[in-house]
Amino acid sequence: MAGVDEVGRGALFGPVVAAAVLVPIEAINQLQALGVKDSKQLSPQHRSQLAQALPDYVHSYGISFADVPTINRVNIRQASLLAMERAVQKLPVMPAWVLVDGRDTLPHIAMAQMAVTGGDRKSLLISAASILAKVWRDTLITRLAERFPGYDLASNKGYGTAKHRQGLRQYGATPLHRPLFCRKIIENPD
């Protein structure tokens, strides 16, 4: 059985990232003992520790993303689904079932699926995927922050904090900002 989740859907900057984890049924209790839960409920340090430990507890995992041009072309919802599909396709063994965080199943994946609203809080498989995706994306954004100073990306990870919004108003958008998300901030400073 596999779980898949995405992160970065509401960000102003950078890709949407997804991870899929394939976990043998008998190993699910080990995830709970390890302390796996929704990545948003964990400190950055704890998330990082779990992301390092998870490969020892899961059969396999896949991580993928949809970049800003893709988000602009197809919209954030479709880009999120695409990133999750790609993450599942990176698994070396196709699972019998996929639990998908959110209200949508993956339209181009021909296997049994269940959409789980709030799945990152309800399913250890989806929680494990959310941790891997979050750590991967946060690491990427932290590296990109060096190329794009002035937006406080190392702290906000691309989300719309006050400092990030101020940077957009002062410097404009970079090529890795999502234009549709940023336009209103830049045009309407209030």
UniProtKB/Swiss-Prot annotation:
Major localization listed first in the record, in broad terms: cytoplasm
UniProt-listed GO biological process terms: DNA replication, removal of RNA primer; mismatch repair
Any Pfam family the entry gives: RNase_HII
Cofactor note: Manganese or magnesium. Binds 1 divalent metal ion per monomer in the absence of substrate. May bind a second metal ion after substrate binding.
Gene Ontology terms for molecular function: manganese ion binding; RNA binding; RNA-DNA hybrid ribonuclease activity
Enzyme class name: hydrolase
Domain RNase H type-2: 1-190
EC number: 3.1.26.4
Alphabetized SUPFAM superfamilies for the sequence: Ribonuclease H-like
Cell compartments where the protein resides: Cytoplasm
Keywords: Cytoplasm, Endonuclease, Hydrolase, Manganese, Metal-binding, Nuclease
Binding-site residues, a divalent metal cation: 5-6, 101
CC annotations in GO: cytoplasm; ribonuclease H2 complex
CC cofactor: Mn(2+); Mg(2+)
Catalysed reactions listed for this entry: Endonucleolytic cleavage to 5'-phosphomonoester
Family named by the database record: Belongs to the RNase HII family.
Function: Endonuclease that specifically degrades the RNA of RNA-DNA hybrids.
This protein's name: Ribonuclease HII
Organism from which the protein derives: Synechocystis sp. (strain ATCC 27184 / PCC 6803 / Kazusa)
Gene: rnhB
